Amino acid sequence: NRDKELADPQGFGLIEYAFSRMAADAGIDMSECRLHQEGGRSHFMTRRFDRTSTGDKLHMQSLAAIRHFDFNAAGAYAYEQAIETIRRLGLPAVDIEQQFRRAIFNILIRNQDDHVKNIAFLMDRTGAWRLSPAYDVAYAYNPSGPWTRQHQMSLNGKRDDFDLEDLVAFGGYCGFSRRRALALVAETSAPVSAWRAYADDAGVYE
């Protein structure tokens, strides 16, 4: 995974913060986050979503756990299987739309550490499942590395070199019309095109 393959550069907390804010503006459900400054370093802090407001634990299962998928098997699983799981759990349509946005966002920002442990589900006290907020959402790409040179999960049968028709086809699998899929892609991509503004606001400089 990214921890094995990519170094944790100084200032990565700032990068995570910028991407978290960008993802939220792209319509992705993100936990509240902030930066903690300490000793000249910036630490990315995010509120735990597997706890209630009173601190009680919520049951959480990753896609890997709930489907018995091996997250080390790069390319063995697909975003379509995440959608299939959402349907099998009987989750609402908004969760399908959420997962669509997250897949598109990962492709647009080259978050290629998008393995099956980075999608999760929460069960509340009544036993009802929901898609958890997104996490580990940041640029992760190493063209010479065995792990993140391609996406960990495929989409429309591909792990790289996606085009708009691939995203529309995935939207069709999610149950969206072509028009709706294109609208969601546009909404998700708009903040990505403003990366420099998010980076500057977070203090990320070239």
Task: Mark where each language-model region is.
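Small/polar glycine-rich anion-binding or flexible loop at a beta-alpha turn
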Residues: 39, 182-193
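Conserved ATP-binding subdomain of kinase catalytic cores across diverse folds
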Residues: 1-74
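Generic, well-ordered alpha-helical scaffold segments in large soluble proteins
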Residues: 22-29, 49, 66-69, 85, ...
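Conserved kinase catalytic-core segment
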Residues: 10-26, 78-142
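Regulatory N- and C-terminal appendages and interdomain linkers associated
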Residues: 129-131, 143, 173, 190, ...
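Short, surface-exposed acidic
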Residues: 176-185, 206
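Catalytic-core segments of enzymes that bind and process phosphorylated/nucleotide-bearing substrates
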Residues: 62, 66-85, 124-179
